Design a protein with these regions (language model features):
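Secreted/periplasmic carbohydrate-active enzymes, especially glycoside hydrolases
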Residues: 1-106, 127-130, 136, 143-146, ...
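Short, solvent-exposed turn/loop segments enriched in Gly/Ser/Thr/Pro and often Arg
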Residues: 27-32, 50-54, 86-95, 109-114, ...
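Alpha-helical scaffolding within the catalytic cores
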Residues: 32-36, 91-96, 118, 123-136, ...
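Short acidic, glycine/proline-rich loop/turn micro-motifs
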Residues: 58, 117-119, 247-252
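Flexible, glycine- and charge-enriched loops at secondary-structure boundaries
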Residues: 62, 66, 120-124, 156, ...
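Active-site cleft segment of glycoside hydrolase catalytic domains centered on the general acid/base Glu
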Residues: 117-124, 148-174, 183
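Active-site groove signature of glycoside hydrolases
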Residues: 130-158, 279-285
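Substrate-binding clefts and catalytic carboxylate motifs of secreted carbohydrate-active enzymes
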Residues: 145-147, 161, 167-172, 179-180, ...
């Protein structure tokens, strides 16, 4: 029996020598792309995902235990997910293993993001070492299908050289899994979006972050946007969304209300349905999390409020919008 999100079958595998014995639970599956499709065990799948930070479910702190992982992933399961993006760094091993047991495919990444020192050799060695450590630890986790090498990195020649080396390093260590990165979109003319990044040639999927309706216009802009892509690869939106304070209500046009976030997700879902070759999404983010960059008093209070679940575990209205779409997708891919 091959491992799938619907039937996450694991086998006990024992290895022994004269001096040592190792036992592990391992699943078996295949993963590949074919044109704009992602194929798991030669069957097309849609990655119904969500992004997750390594934070405890009901209070501020670093998640580290199996119980923490199970709670976070149970929310993702209720949302209708079969996939999680563990951002923006390798999460603890309990999270990856619990995701495997519960039937979640995984995008795992290293913290190469924004504007780092691309031409610094020590910076590259740091990134490569984290990449090697991540792959060495989780190479036998069948649910990990994407190694991500970057997040929101502005275009430049030094950046491309840096990430090219990382992509090549991934494939030298693991030539089976998919290589991704969270690139950035571009509005080539009013209402027409694409990804125009030479890094995309090195990746197995066209993966990118976009915040149409939040950092880019209002929610109604989603109604006017169309997407075009030249490459025949699966399209994957690694981040989308907007913020809301749980319990804050008002007009659908008033930012940080649950109604604005709900409306944004409704319009976003309709926009996503128009994207050619879309094979997966991981909206930002499952749960509100601490962020010292977020200072709006009585709303943010040093929290990023883009979660579909509050920092206290309360589900916002947008949670149920995404849940409804994911349930529809689950039925359509049966």
């Amino acid at each position: 029996v091959l491992w799938t999100p619907e039937e996450p079958k694991l086998y006990v595998v024992n290895l022994s020598s004269e001096t040592d014995k190792v036992s592990d639970e391992i699943g078996f599956r295949t993963i590949r792309t074919e044109g704009t499709k992602i194929l798991l065990n030669d069957e097309e799948i849609f990655c119904r995902g969500i992004s997750i930070h390594e934070e405890t479910p009901y209070y501020s702190g670093r998640a580290y235990s199996r119980d923490h992982a199970r709670t976070l992933l149970s929310w993702a399961k209720e949302l209708g997910c079969n996939f999680v993006r563990l951002a923006h760094y390798p999460h603890n091993e309990e999270m990856v293993r619990e995701a495997e047991r519960m039937g979640f495919l995984v995008w795992s990444e290293i913290p190469v993001y924004w504007t780092i020192h691309w031409e610094n050799k020590d910076t590259y060695q740091n990134a490569e070492q984290q990449l090697c450590d991540m792959i060495a630890r989780d190479k036998n986790r069948c649910n990990v299908i994407i190694w991500s090498i970057a997040n929101e990195t502005p275009l430049s020649e030094p950046r491309l050289a840096f990430l090219t080396k990382l992509a090549n390093k991934v494939r030298s260590l693991d030539n089976v899994r998919l290589v991704g990165a969270a690139m950035e979109k571009e509005e080539v003319r009013p209402g027409v979006m694409t990804v125009n990044d030479p890094l995309g040639e090195l990746l197995d999927i066209i993966s990118f972050n976009e915040y149409v309706g939040w950092y880019d216009g209002d929610s109604e802009k989603c109604d006017r946007v169309n997407w075009v892509f030249d490459a025949r690869k699966p399209v994957f939106i690694s981040e989308l969304g907007g913020g809301a304070l749980y319990g804050r209500h008002g007009s659908r046009k008033e930012r940080f209300t649950e109604e604005y976030q709900e409306d944004l997700y409704i319009r976003h879902v309709n926009m996503l349905k128009r994207i050619p070759g879309l094979a997966g999404t991981t909206p930002w983010i499952l749960k509100d999390f601490r962020s010292p960059r977020r200072h709006v008093p009585e709303i943010q209070d040093d929290f990023n409020r883009k979660g579909l679940v509050s920092d206290k575990g309360q589900k916002k209205k947008a949670f149920f919008v995404l849940q409804k779409w994911y349930r529809e997708l689950e039925e359509s891919y049966k």
